[in-house]
C-alpha cells in the first residue's frame, strides 16, 4: 500500500516520499502524462505502468509483506497480487535510490500543464 511504498522510498533514498516524490515531474503522484522529465520521473512512469498491469489488484491499499536488510528490500510471501504490488514498489524505490544523483528540486511540485509532450506507451 502507499504507506509501505513511502517506507521503501525512505529506506532507499533517505527522503520522505511526501513531499519529495508526490508531485515530482510529470509522473510521480496521481496520474501522469507527457514525457518523463528525467530518470527519477521515469521511475514513476515505469511504476505507473507496473500498477496498470495489475488489473485485479488494489495496489494503493493492499498490504504486502517485505523485509529490509543492509539496504536490500525483499518482498515476502502473500497472494499473487500482494507479491506483484510489492515488486512494483520495490523496483521504484530502488530506481529512486539509483537516480538520487540526478534528482532535481526544480521538478518538485511540477505543474501538470507543462507536461505537453506526447505520452509514451508502457
Curated annotation (Swiss-Prot):
Molecular function via GO: calcium ion binding; calcium-dependent phospholipase A2 activity; phospholipid binding; toxin activity
Main location per the UniProt record: secreted
One example of a Gene Ontology biological process annotation: negative regulation of T cell proliferation
EC number: 3.1.1.4
Record key words, sorted: Calcium, Disulfide bond, Hydrolase, Lipid degradation, Lipid metabolism, Metal-binding, Myotoxin, Secreted, Toxin
Keyword Plastid applies: no
Top EC class of this enzyme: hydrolase
Cofactor(s) needed for function: Ca(2+)
Subcellular location: Secreted
Family: Belongs to the phospholipase A2 family. Group II subfamily. D49 sub-subfamily.
Taxon lineage: Eukaryota, Metazoa, Chordata, Craniata, Vertebrata
Pfam families cross-referenced by the UniProt entry: Phospholip_A2_1 (PF00068)
Keyword Secreted attached: yes
Record organism: Sistrurus miliarius streckeri (Western pigmy rattlesnake)
Tissues where this protein is expressed: Expressed by the venom gland.
Disulfide bonds: 26-115, 28-44, 43-95, 49-122, 50-88, 57-81, 75-86
Amino acids binding Ca(2+): 27, 29, 31, 48
Catalytic activity: a 1,2-diacyl-sn-glycero-3-phosphocholine + H2O = a 1-acyl-sn-glycero-3-phosphocholine + a fatty acid + H(+)
Protein name: Basic phospholipase A2 Sms-N6
Function in brief: Snake venom phospholipase A2 (PLA2) that shows myotoxic activities. PLA2 catalyzes the calcium-dependent hydrolysis of the 2-acyl groups in 3-sn-phosphoglycerides.
Cofactor remark from the record: Binds 1 Ca(2+) ion.
